[in-house]
Swiss-Prot record:
Lineage: superkingdom: Bacteria
Catalysed conversion reaction: adenosine(1518)/adenosine(1519) in 16S rRNA + 4 S-adenosyl-L-methionine = N(6)-dimethyladenosine(1518)/N(6)-dimethyladenosine(1519) in 16S rRNA + 4 S-adenosyl-L-homocysteine + 4 H(+)
Gene Ontology MF annotations: 16S rRNA (adenine(1518)-N(6)/adenine(1519)-N(6))-dimethyltransferase activity; RNA binding; rRNA (adenine-N6,N6-)-dimethyltransferase activity
Protein name, per record: Ribosomal RNA small subunit methyltransferase A
InterPro entries linked to this entry: KsgA/Erm, rRNA_Ade_diMease-like_C, rRNA_Ade_Mease_Trfase_CS, rRNA_Ade_methylase_Trfase_N, rRNA_adenine_dimethylase, SAM-dependent_MTases_sf
Location of the protein in the cell: Cytoplasm
Presence of keyword Transcription regulation: no
A Gene Ontology BP annotation from the UniProt entry: rRNA methylation
Task performed by this protein: Specifically dimethylates two adjacent adenosines (A1518 and A1519) in the loop of a conserved hairpin near the 3'-end of 16S rRNA in the 30S particle. May play a critical role in biogenesis of 30S subunits.
Entry binding sites for S-adenosyl-L-methionine: 18, 20, 45, 66, 91, 113
SUPFAM superfamilies: S-adenosyl-L-methionine-dependent methyltransferases
Enzyme Commission designation: 2.1.1.182
Length: 273
């Protein structure tokens, strides 16, 4: 028996497809999402509708984004979901969530069992639309969830941690074993809730500057920031900001990264691209 086949559909490796089939896990995720009629619910990667069906039962309308044309066609003809669905057969990485929110007339509630091969770039894509998003619930590789929630002074803490926590409150919801999927992935999974901050705790003047600083610091995470960020900040400047130049990227808090970004925006702003 081919364990990549589920409900007659062959899971495609290039799309990173693993289909959720554990009823307890599904019910737990739907309870965490708590969908309500009238909300602008958007599912990324509905697949074989493991979450789509129980969420759709509670709603009059549901928007889904599915790259796989065969799965999109199955959803179109679904006996009870079909009429409720607005289906975008496209890559979520190309979706303008700001325009979608404007069309639906309210902030989006986004959820999904995300393909692990695109989960990190998709997170960064969604962060650029947090003004249009009320909250997000995602099934991800457990390692990615650990990175999203990590604090300074841990090996999981990295650029993804800083950028996620800059934009959102990040809350782990539950852990999910490989046995909950067909085919079983080789890694553990977890569900995370991301709620965009209503008021930014550490506002930055130019997000591109924060992105640049975190990229340069974490690309050389074993170096002290005196070296990894030496092209941007002098030792004196770091010391004036109360940041020890002997620290490494993983020792610096989100607030401190934002402080550095604002200093750079004021003193050496990036040119408009």
């Amino acid at each position: 028996m081919n364990n990549r086949v589920h409900q007659g559909h062959l899971a495609r490796k290039r799309f990173g497809q693993n289909f959720l089939n554990d009823r307890f896990v599904i019910d737990s995720i739907v309870s965490a999402i708590n969908p309500q009629k009238g909300q602008a619910m958007v599912e990324i990667g509905p697949g074989l509708a493991a979450l789509t069906e129980p969420v759709g039962e509670r709603l009059d309308k549901l928007t889904v984004i599915e790259l796989d044309r065969d799965l999109a066609a199955r959803l179109q003809t679904h006996p009870f979901l079909g009429p409720k669905l607005t289906i975008y057969q496209q890559d979520a990485m190309t979706m303008n969530f700001g325009e979608l929110s404007a069309q639906l007339g309210q902030p989006l509630r986004v959820f999904g069992n995300l393909p692990y091969n695109i989960s990190t770039p998709l997170m960064f894509h969604l962060f650029s639309y947090t003004d249009a998003i009320a909250d997000m619930h995602f099934m991800l590789q457990k390692e990615v969830v650990n990175r999203l929630v990590a604090g300074p002074n841990s090996k999981e803490y990295g650029r993804l941690s800083v950028m996620a926590q800059y934009y959102c409150q990040v809350i782990p919801v539950l852990e999910v074993p490989p046995s909950a999927f067909t085919p079983p992935p080789k890694v553990d999974s977890a569900v995370v809730r991301l709620v965009p901050h209503a008021t930014m705790p550490y506002p930055v003047k130019d997000i591109r500057v924060l992105s640049r600083i975190t990229t340069e610091a974490f690309n050389q995470r074993r170096k002290t920031i005196r070296n990894s960020l030496g092209n941007l900040f002098s030792v004196e400047t770091l010391t004036e900001m109360g940041i020890d130049p002997a620290m490494r990227a993983e020792n610096i808090s989100v607030a401190q990264y934002c402080q550095m970004a604002n200093y750079l925006s004021e003193n050496a702003p990036l040119k408009e691209s």
